[in-house]
Amino acid sequence: MSTMFLRTLREDPADADVDSAKLLQRAGYIRKAAPGIWTWLPLGLRVLNKIEAIIREEINGIGAQEVHFPALLPREPYEATHRWEEYGDNIFRLKDRHEADYLLAPTHEEMFTLLVKDMYSSYKDLPVTLYQIQTKYRDEFRPRAGLIRGREFVMKDAYSFTIDEEGMRKAYYDERGAYERIFQRLDLKYVPVFAMSGPMGGSASEEFLAPMPIGEDTFALAPSGKAWNVEALSTPELPEIDASTTPAASKEATPDAKTIDNMIERANADHPRTDGREWQASDILKNVVITVKHPEDEEHDEPWREVIVVGVPGDRTVDMKRLEAQFAPAELEEATEEDLKQHPELVPGYIGPMVLGPQAEAAGVKNPVRYLIDAHVVKGSAWFTGADENEVDYYNLVYGRDFKVDGVVEAVEVRHGDMSPDGSGPLSFERGVEIGQVFQLGLKYSKALDLKVLDQNGKAVPVWMGCYGIGVSRVLACIAETHHDEAGLAWPSVIAPAAVHVVATGKDAVAFEGAEKLVAELEAKGLEVIYDDRKKVSPGVKFKDAELIGVPLVAVVGRDYVNDGTIELRDRNGENKVAVPAAEAADALAERFAALS
């Protein structure tokens, strides 16, 4: 360590917000270059390279072939798939000296597709799966959590190309199986969850989440063991309500009833229910005005805005992230005053269905607003809701009888105890970090970029694609996040920067000679070693650094070696401490390390 490019820190960096970011910097694995941008130091690269080696072994094992694309990419392919616009501010864009547009790659779907298009033309060339491990770039608005949410990161991305949908599915499950083996070998707990495809497009997707409290993603678990990303949850179909005995809708004055609580109080005082119970928040149809910011598309030459209204039960709140996933690649925001001015029929506090969507024409509305409802609003249900006049509401307005909608969406937050989509029981929730995702892309990119091959009949057909990503640098951070204690990191043996941390203590040259001999014996057995040969550093500091760096095994060569020729062996956490004769130390350490692997 006296010559190793390494400096450990005693204090946590002031801006480190999660344990992995604190420990990786303190232990000398990474250094911050700028927000969301990190320099890899020798120890960090050792671990990163070992993770990459495991990924390569498993991905090569399913027949994939490695390539390497540039990170600086031209604009044109991304325009063809509309992702130049869809990514918005999330990508780094630049111009060369000739004013040509480029971007720093956030992903490489377009480039992989064009490469196969350039080289392959027949069904006989397929199937093929290509992958790379490469640096990606995304202009995160607020980088956080160290390597977990950065602007520059290392990612493994693979793409399968097959002649038909069946081939795509086979490639998908081959890759999925390889992912499970990778995470198991890395000793990283994971949960596969059903997910939305988002801007990537495609028909099916699963995320691999590492459960941990700092995770940005919430996922739902069913008693059956199945799991869903919250955005991908679907509400089990609810039975239609028989509205034959529901009183006719009535429109009544409701002064001072702009809030849910005011509406409930007013309803119970002025309009008692006929079914023996009081009005409650779940009886109120809350209509939320939202602006959809669409990117450019085939019908619009520039981004455009659309105002919509979403109806949800009054006891639920709109989950914008969940709702936005269904509008991808568009973005959602609460409607502005300027948006509302375009629709004078929307009376704040009293917005109701009777001027929206299918009802707009009968109400004389010339610029109708699309009306969507959450899946918890079932046909036949009667509602207390706005009447589109100031201080006036409807009672007993029945969905299906009195008003219709333009569509049904998953709009509200999901609660603990809600029924799971598979009907196996109530949902519970955990948080996790996405470490991988697999997509069945289908024909999205092959059609957009005209990737076709001749089939067995000589007909040009589009190629079926799959996409598979692992956040390599994020995986490293997640392992650090889940493999540490108060003293420091505790790496799984398979990716630790070394097998043994040899510590020479004291001032006697004999101890250092014994340590050097042990290092040579360990290296002769093929074991990597970190050797702390610093002579002006106290034993206490050396032991603290050994715990901080997190190598699985520690060997102490000091006073006991000088006095009786023994070397102390122990695990990183200080357990299984034993003194062995120096001649047996290398073999004992090799056996211990083999047992860990």
Curated annotation (Swiss-Prot):
GO terms for cellular component: cytosol. The keyword rRNA processing does not apply. It is found in: Cytoplasm. CDD domains: ProRS_anticodon_short, ProRS_core_prok. Gene3D superfamilies: Anticodon-binding domain (3.40.50.800), Bira Bifunctional Protein, Domain 2 (3.30.930.10), YbaK/aminoacyl-tRNA synthetase-associated domain (3.90.960.10). GO terms for biological process: prolyl-tRNA aminoacylation. GO terms for molecular function: aminoacyl-tRNA deacylase activity; ATP binding; proline-tRNA ligase activity. Pfam families: HGTP_anticodon (PF03129), tRNA-synt_2b (PF00587), tRNA_edit (PF04073). Keywords: Aminoacyl-tRNA synthetase, ATP-binding, Cytoplasm, Ligase, Nucleotide-binding, Protein biosynthesis. It is an enzyme of class 6 (ligase). Homodimer. Belongs to the class-II aminoacyl-tRNA synthetase family. ProS type 1 subfamily. PANTHER family: MITOCHONDRIAL RIBOSOME PROTEIN L39/PROLYL-TRNA LIGASE FAMILY MEMBER (PTHR42753), PROLINE--TRNA LIGASE (PTHR42753:SF2). Catalyzes the attachment of proline to tRNA(Pro) in a two-step reaction: proline is first activated by ATP to form Pro-AMP and then transferred to the acceptor end of tRNA(Pro). As ProRS can inadvertently accommodate and process non-cognate amino acids such as alanine and cysteine, to avoid such errors it has two additional distinct editing activities against alanine. One activity is designated as 'pretransfer' editing and involves the tRNA(Pro)-independent hydrolysis of activated Ala-AMP. Consists of three domains: the N-terminal catalytic domain, the editing domain and the C-terminal anticodon-binding domain. This is Proline--tRNA ligase.
